[in-house]
Amino acid sequence: MAAGRRNVLLIVVDQWRADFVPRLGAGFLRTPNLDRLCREGVAFRNHVTTAVPCGPARASLLTGLYLMNHRAVQNTVPLDTRHMNLGKALRLIGYDPALIGYTTTTPDPRTTGPRDPRFTSLGDLMDGFRSVGAFEPTMDGYFGWLAQKGFRLPERREDIWLPEGEDAVPGATDRPCRVPAELSDSAYFTERALAYLKGKGGKPWFLHLGYYRPHPPFVAPAPYNAMYRPADMPAPVRRASPAEE
């Protein structure tokens, strides 16, 4: 790391509730790597998302603006290119901000043409970041990685996240998905991140590492599908009566 220049790893996860983070009170869960990150890093206990779903939430996180100001009010709504964001700001101070994962950003239509394929998907990458392992909407990179690893993809590639023999999410299930844990999308992101960081040497870096999980479908690979028993989970936080809710 260059003198006076910090290395920064920003990990963004999708739909992980704060009250299900062990270091923040969810002692019934086992997440040793996350525990270490919280222990050796900084945990912002009062940091809350300002918007839903994921695209608007990421727009707020990375621009520092409320939804009413950046106006990307739902997935596929374009983000105005005039807004400063974290990637652009980092470039101004000499970083080359890298991104693994995704930001669910639809481009400003004034910067491209109407046939731009990014308008036909749930979003692309936010300006300012350099992709070093994007989880593009078609997921071609991840599926190609699986094939290169020798995993036989089903005819409908997305079925890897379903239990064997199912063609739709079967509701609440403890059956494992078809892809093994070592070939999960989380493993893919982690491998790409480690490869990128090992190649940086002593140069300062900023890496936005965006994981897809625990985003649905809620079908985990073995052995994680059987790690917890439903009976051991805490009851939902409810009001005293349906009328109060």
Segment roles from a protein language model:
Residues 1-245:
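Formylglycine-dependent sulfatase
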